[in-house]
Swiss-Prot record:
It is found in: Cytoplasm; Nucleus. Its main location: cytoplasm. This is Ribonucleoside-diphosphate reductase subunit M2. The gene is Rrm2. It comes from the Eukaryota. The modification Phosphothreonine is found at residue 33. The modification Phosphoserine is found at residue 20. Provides the precursors necessary for DNA synthesis. Catalyzes the biosynthesis of deoxyribonucleotides from the corresponding ribonucleotides. Inhibits Wnt signaling.
Length: 390
């Protein structure tokens, strides 16, 4: 007889219970054991944790725009209206160098250039006129940046002095290039076409648009824009300067080549000043970011002088011109305090002899490295005394 406490079960139920895994499951000593996860669920759980951890790290590492108050060059300076006492002596010396190098367009003799111009091949005239058109427009773009952005952002008096003088020199450069176009090009329609190069020439427009984008970029830091305009004056101009020095090597266009010496020296100084301002920054762009800006400018300049306006028109080697632009970019990277990108040698031996200070011009009475008398001397050097030994 069955006990009243025993569960009633059919034979089928007993057989099913006998086959079930639950019958073999032992719960002895398992009271505090946590439930186990399948391997798939374990992997999924780990992956989820890793994703959330990575996203949290990315958020914490997200680049934040440095505060203006953290940059001595940019923070509010109530003493910016007075020059003395000098606080940044290295910046002040750059300003005095620029001041000592002042020149005007009227000092360049173009009388011999007309005869040379008429003797040039059509391809050579085409190349020179288009390079001059680019130069005439680009100096205005550099000034736009100085007036609209840099001069208003930088609060250090010494730097403001330099920027003010740079604006004056860029105006003289633009006047010089416009004067060259006006002297060489007699056809009024062609002159108008060249003076409006930003709108009429796609190759010039591409370079101009790149620079103008940096002027209008409200998100880019001052440091990024300093690098960009160092690239404009150091890389965008480099190939065109070299092409005109190539004409000098051939003994052509004395007025053009002498003005090119003066302007290339000025632009070299402007580029050096940009690097100096970069070094004074507390929060600099990363090397990767600087590399990105420089390589973009190199690509655009290489395309300009090897495809859009190939230097082969004046007898230069396009491959070597590409290498020269890379060489200039490497030099700029070093000046900014970073490693070289391309690691190439200077392929143009004639450019080795052209320093930023300039060399005596064979055709000119004046020399390209001249400076205004007394500008770089100390006040004690010009004092009058009676203590000389006779």
């Amino acid at each position: 007889m069955l006990s009243v406490r025993a569960p009633l079960a059919t034979i089928a139920d007993q057989q099913q219970l006998h086959l079930s895994p639950l019958k073999r499951l032992s719960l002895a000593d398992k009271e505090n054991t946590p439930p186990t996860l399948s391997s798939a669920r374990v992997l999924a759980s780990k992956a989820a944790r890793r994703i959330f951890q990575d996203s949290a790290e990315l958020e914490s590492k997200a680049p934040t725009k440095p505060s203006i108050e953290e940059e001595p060059l940019l923070r509010e300076n109530p003493r910016r209206f007075v020059v003395f006492p000098i606080e940044y002596h290295d910046i002040w010396q750059m300003y005095k160098k620029a001041e000592a190098s002042f020149w005007t367009a009227e000092e360049v003799d173009l009388s011999k250039d007309i005869q040379h111009w008429e003797a040039l091949k059509p391809d050579e005239r085409h190349f020179i006129s288009h390079v001059l058109a680019f130069f005439a427009a680009s100096d205005g773009i550099v000034n736009e940046n100085l007036v609209e952005r840099f001069s208003q952002e930088v609060q250090v008096t010494e730097a403001r002095c330099f920027y003010g003088f740079q604006i004056a020199m860029e105006n003289i450069h633009s006047e010089m290039y416009s004067l060259l176009i006006d002297t060489y090009i007699k056809d009024s329609k062609e002159r108008e076409y060249l003076f409006n190069a930003i709108e009429t020439m796609p190759c010039v427009k591409k370079k101009a648009d790149w620079a103008l984008r940096w002027i209008g970029d409200k998100e880019a830091t001052y440091g990024e824009r300093v690098v960009a305009f160092a690239a404009v004056e150091g890389i965008f101009f480099s190939g065109s300067f070299a092409s005109i020095f190539w004409l000098k090597k051939r003994g052509l266009m004395p007025g053009l080549t002498f003005s090119n010496e003066l302007i290339s020296r000025d632009e070299g100084l402007h580029c050096d000043f940009a690097c100096l301002m970069f070094k004074h920054l507390v929060h600099k762009p990363s090397e990767q970011r600087v590399k990105e800006i420089i390589t973009n400018s190199v690509r655009i300049e290489q395309e300009f002088l090897t495809e859009a306006l190939p230097v082969k028109l004046i007898g230069m080697n396009c491959t070597l011109m590409k290498q020269y632009i890379e060489f200039v970019a490497d030099r700029l990277m070093l000046e900014l305090g970073f490693n070289k990108i391309f690691k190439v040698e200077n392929p143009f031996d004639f450019m080795e002899n052209i320093s930023l200070e300039g060399k005596t011009n064979f055709f000119e009475k004046r020399v390209g490295e001249y400076q205004r008398m007394g500008v770089m001397s100390n006040s004690t050097e010009n004092s009058f005394t009676l203590d000389a030994d006779f």
